[in-house]
């Protein structure tokens, strides 16, 4: 089958696919529009010939000349060495891999055309493995595109497939011209003209404008892509508004103004005053579960936390499903906000589920929620994959009967045997750690089981609260999360001591261990984190085990624990109990303690090979300390290995950690370093939404797309649907998760 029939808008052929056709599918090039939108990485200029006297080192040059010398050198590595003379100079052509046919093409006296990068050196001008053709052929009339590809997919085949897809694709304009006129893109560059130009640019165009995507043709595509993103998310938001959800109404969590010594409402907020008033006997609490929980808490909520609680409770009091993201820095107090939302749900006679990505984090949530809610008469169930059969049966019975009003667990919550009686609110912590399929499974389970005595299950969708300790920069919230309502806790609870972060060379490891001795002498505890080596679990385990052995020998009399991903769940829990209770002085761990672990007595975090960690991950790990009143520190141990110095990206990450504790600033810098696609992980394990636009560099176009989407959806719904289908196809499942 030819590349011209490798993709189409219709069903796939039943004939077996060839190697290149399989490669096209691997790239996701299934439709003609996919091929048309598969744009070049770069371009090569085959439209002109240059003279060797005019070239400089580093140039990509195309030269014609005569072969004046050719030999196969049989030294240490077999090479074909050819000298080319164009009358103005000579160039050495060097090939380390070649067939006899190439020797024939480059035989002495042959006239040839070669194209490649000019290099310098003791032999003079050199090309390594240039492209070779017979001389005298017609020159290209457009720049030659070089496309993203995979093994088994030659550029020549891919170019033909793309050109065929471009010819067949339906490329009529889907964006009304009046919208494009606002940004000066109509009628100069319609969709077909823009794509045709980018696949076949004329030789007089600025290569810089093509490479940095500032050319008007690129602007047209980026504007359309951003508009498709905004339309798809607005469609998702409006579709949810048509669904029914349980109404979880409760009296507002506000209290009468009272005066309590040493507690200022301006500083702490009304809720904190009420908490103090109840404890001091000044006020009788309201009798809703949420109010009783609020006043029974052993700490005072901030005004920001209360504002976020109000946003959530207003959402779940409506008959449409909430779809809200709660973001806050490490230790900002998101769990208590979730607990108050759960209390409102349970007050209304419904069940709530909280799903966490790891058993350690789920265990911590369970312990905390039991401590807060059990004294108030609430049954909290616990469900994980490692439970023993009897305990699991007991938990499943509590859940299905409705006796368990709150269920905490891992992905075990989405298994088929788990049957809720009346589930109305799902809370997903560290939602980015779950794949889209897992989040969709929980949502599907919620929809099938959202029922109560007073309301049939059919058509009822539960409320969804997602939480993340990885703050999302504003530009990404406006683009990748435009379908969600976002609540932000942008301040830490009072009493937190800022963490001092030091970047230390591995050569000073003994000094770090000496500092650990000092912390132990003061009764403090220490984390020592080893990097998770994805390529080898065995190497990961060896690394952590060796560090554990070394620290145990260097710290006689100190209990040093070991925690890693390959340990059975029961052993992990036992180690964490020892550390939480203070019996372990040092905990050597891989990144299984990255999120959620809360031990206020831990005051020092040492991260080994910090240069291997991402910036967000480093910040999450640092957040395990600084949770008590004691001064806390984070030591970033780095090693350059065999290199003379750290790479620039690693230096930027470590520098950012040393300069700020602010998670929102960390997120901004992380976005700068990695770019939106990698930062988001394609909306956390979903399909990527932006291939061409950059939400930072294209802020003007993003603002236009945000303003245009609602107008287009209202005034031209058919065109809006066609536009989303063209750009995203079926890649919108994650909007439901």
Question: Predicted segments — roles?
Answer:
Residues 1-30:
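Helix-hairpin-helix
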Residues 18-23, 31, 248-257, 273-326:
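Conserved pre-motif I regulatory segment
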Residues 38-68:
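OB-fold nucleic-acid-binding modules
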Residues 57, 73-260, 267-268, 273-296, ...:
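Upstream accessory/linker segments immediately N-terminal to the RecA-like ATPase cores of bacterial MutS
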Residues 89-102, 139-156, 180, 207-217, ...:
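Short hinge/gating elements
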Residues 304-310, 317-655, 665, 707, ...:
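Inter-lobe coupling/hinge segments of SF2-like helicase ATPases
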Residues 633, 641-737:
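C-terminal accessory region of SF2 helicases/translocases
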């Amino acid at each position: 089958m030819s590349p011209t029939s490798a993709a189409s808008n219709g069903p796939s052929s039943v004939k077996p696919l060839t190697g290149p056709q399989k490669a096209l599918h691997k790239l996701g090039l299934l439709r003609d529009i996919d091929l048309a939108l598969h744009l070049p990485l770069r371009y090569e200029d085959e439209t002109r010939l240059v003279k060797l006297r005019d070239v400089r080192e580093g140039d990509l040059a195309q030269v014609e000349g005569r072969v004046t010398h050719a030999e196969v050198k049989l030294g240490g590595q077999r090479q074909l060495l050819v000298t080319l003379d164009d009358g103005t100079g000579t160039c050495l052509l060097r090939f380390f891999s070649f067939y006899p046919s190439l020797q024939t093409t480059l035989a002495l006296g042959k006239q040839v055309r070669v194209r490649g990068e000019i290099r310098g050196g003791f032999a003079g001008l050199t090309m390594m493995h240039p492209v070779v053709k017979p001389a005298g052929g017609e020159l290209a009339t457009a720049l030659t595109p070089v496309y993203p590809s995979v093994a088994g997919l030659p550029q020549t085949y891919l170019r033909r497939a793309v050109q065929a897809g471009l010819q067949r694709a339906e490329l009529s304009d889907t964006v009304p011209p009046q919208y494009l006129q606002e940004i000066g893109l109509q009628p100069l560059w319609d969709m077909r003209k823009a794509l045709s130009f980018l696949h076949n640019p004329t030789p007089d165009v600025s290569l810089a404008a093509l490479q940095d995507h500032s050319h008007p043709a690129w602007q047209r595509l980026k504007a359309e892509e951003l508009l498709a993103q905004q339309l798809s998310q607005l469609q998702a938001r409006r579709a949810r508004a048509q669904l029914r959800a349980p109404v979880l109404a409760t009296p507002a969590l506000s209290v009468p103004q009272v005066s309590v010594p040493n507690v200022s409402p301006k500083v702490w907020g009304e809720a904190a005053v009420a908490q103090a008033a109840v404890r001091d006997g000044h006020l009788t609490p309201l009798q809703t579960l949420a109010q009783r929980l609020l006043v029974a808490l052993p700490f005072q909520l901030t005004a920001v936390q209360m504002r976020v609680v109000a946003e959530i409770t207003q959402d779940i009091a409506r008959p449409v499903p909430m779809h809200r993201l709660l973001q806050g820095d490490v230790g900002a107090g998101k769990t208590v906000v979730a607990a108050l939302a759960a209390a409102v749900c349970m007050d209304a006679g419904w069940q709530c589920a909280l799903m966490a990505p790891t058993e350690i984090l789920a265990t911590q949530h369970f312990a905390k929620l039991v401590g807060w809610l059990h004294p108030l008469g609430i049954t909290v169930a616990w469900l994980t994959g490692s439970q023993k059969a009897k305990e699991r049966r007991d938990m499943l019975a509590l859940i299905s009967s409705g006796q368990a009003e709150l269920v905490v667990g891992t992905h075990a919550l989405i298994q088929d045997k788990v049957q809720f009686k009346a589930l109305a609110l799902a809370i997903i912590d560290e939602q980015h750690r779950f794949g889209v399929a897992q989040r969709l499974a929980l949502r599907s389970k919620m929809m099938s089981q959202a029922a109560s005595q007073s309301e049939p299950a059919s058509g009822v969708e539960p409320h969804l609260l997602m939480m993340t300790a990885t703050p999302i920069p504003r530009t990404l919230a406006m683009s990748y999360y435009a379908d969600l309502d976002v609540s932000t806790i942008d301040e830490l609870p009072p009493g937190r001591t800022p963490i001092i972060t030091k970047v230390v060379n591995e050569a000073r490891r003994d000094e770090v261990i000496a500092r650990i001795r000092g912390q132990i002498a003061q009764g403090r505890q220490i984390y020592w984190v080893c990097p998770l080596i994805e390529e080898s679990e065995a190497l990961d385990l060896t690394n952590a085990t060796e560090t554990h052995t070394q620290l145990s020998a260097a710290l006689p009399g100190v209990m040093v624990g070991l925690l890693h991903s390959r340990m059975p769940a029961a052993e992990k829990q036992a180690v964490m109990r020892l550390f939480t209770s203070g019996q372990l002085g040092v905990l050597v761990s891989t990144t299984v303690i990255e999120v959620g672990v809360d031990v206020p007595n831990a005051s020092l975090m040492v991260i080994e090979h910090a240069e291997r960690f991402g910036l967000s991950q480093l910040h999450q790990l640092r957040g395990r300390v600084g949770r008590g009143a004691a001064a806390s520190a984070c030591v970033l141990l780095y090693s350059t290995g065999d290199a003379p110095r750290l790479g620039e990206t690693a230096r930027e990450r470590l520098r950012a950690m040393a300069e700020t504790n602010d998670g929102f600033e960390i997120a901004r810098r992380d976005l700068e370093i990695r770019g939106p696609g990698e930062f988001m992980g394609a909306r956390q394990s979903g399909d990527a939404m932006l291939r061409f636009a950059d939400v930072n560099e294209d802020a003007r176009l993003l603002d236009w797309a945000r303003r245009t989407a609602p107008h287009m959806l209202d005034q031209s719904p058919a065109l809006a649907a066609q536009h989303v289908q063209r750009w995203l196809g079926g890649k919108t499942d994650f909007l439901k998760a």
